[in-house]
Amino acid sequence: TVSQYACQRRTTMENHNQIFTDAFAILAENAEFNESEGPCLAFRRAASLLKSLPHAISSSKDLEGLPCLGDQTKAVIQDILEYGQCSKVQDVLCDDRYQTIKLFTSVFGVGLKTAEKWYRKGFHSLEEVQADNAIHFTKMQKAGFLYYDDISAAVCKAEADAIGQIVEETVRLIAPDAIVTLTGGFRRGKECGHDVDFLITTPEMGKEQLLPKVINLWEKKGLLLYYDLVESTFDKTRLPCRKFEAMDHFQKCFAIIKLKKELAAGRVQKDWKAIRVDFVACPVDNFAFALLGWTGSRQFERDLRRFARHERKMLLDNHALYDKTKKIFLPAKTEEDIFAHLGLDYIPPWQRNA
């Protein structure tokens, strides 16, 4: 039987049901744009389930006994099986609001609320938005427009590795024994992504808050195009957060950095490419939890927390694991330790592409 929890399924990059999961992704995104949380989650859960199946769905009989599929999602699958496409999806793709909100939110620093505001003003293109003198852009949005072409192009694995080398070299100058780990989709074996995520820690507690120094060195070198440094608000006595989307409390930095052209893929007019990079610096005692959280996928993480809460009466987040029955924090040095605490088979990063 197939588990309702993504953390009990093995999901590689090999998706046998892309025609269905692509449709669900569009419907989920549209639901998100309409702030319909329930349907959005239902479509994402269904997509996640289908991604984990070792075979392609070829008839409605294949759906028998599968969890996570409601009437709405089954109707979409049925449509695609019969007509090769789903009319609901086609309607969304042709919808003016969907197209415009998707375009606006593709700008770094533009969220749903802002995109909605621009759409209500009657704007339909990025040019129209930028031409309006009444709009005051945030520092983040200005960077988003300035480097739009670079940032909206995919980042490939070779570029992520090149950035990794730069990060590693810089961090080592500050703390020779620091550990730098590439997280996110690239750690799960993806070939491309939208940004590059790194987790940094040091063997000695308290030495890990080194991002301001990294920023400083890069500013001197002229590597930084934009950055936003968020200081740590971590408190080790606080219980893990119940809300999935809550940002974690470690020191972190959202940046856009220059990658020299010979290191970047594809032909470009200038001799560098702007790439989005996120760094998180965490204490070594929390490293395993942060690594698990930042590796993803989001659906995998969401289900891992849901499993912990409902099946084990435990609270899990990017900082810690807390046993509500015993009223204690459970320590972990590795991701394997966390899976063991939860009584789950260990699932390696490349099988977490839920």
Residue ranges and their predicted role:
Residues 24-40:
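Short, aromatic/basic-rich helix-turn unit that serves as a nucleic-acid recognition element
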Residues 1-14, 28:
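Intrinsically disordered, low-complexity N-terminal extensions of nucleic-acid-metabolism proteins
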Residues 11, 33-34, 87-90, 293-294:
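Short, polar/flexible loop-turn hinges at active-site or ligand-entry regions and domain interfaces
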Residues 261-354:
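Catalytic cores of NTP-dependent nucleotidyl/adenyl transfer enzymes across multiple folds
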Residues 256-260:
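Active-site beta-strand termini and strand-to-loop segments that position acidic
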Residues 14, 40-186, 190-194, 200-255, ...:
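Accessory alpha-helical DNA-binding modules that contact the DNA backbone or grooves
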Residues 13-24:
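Short amphipathic alpha-helical heptad-repeat segments
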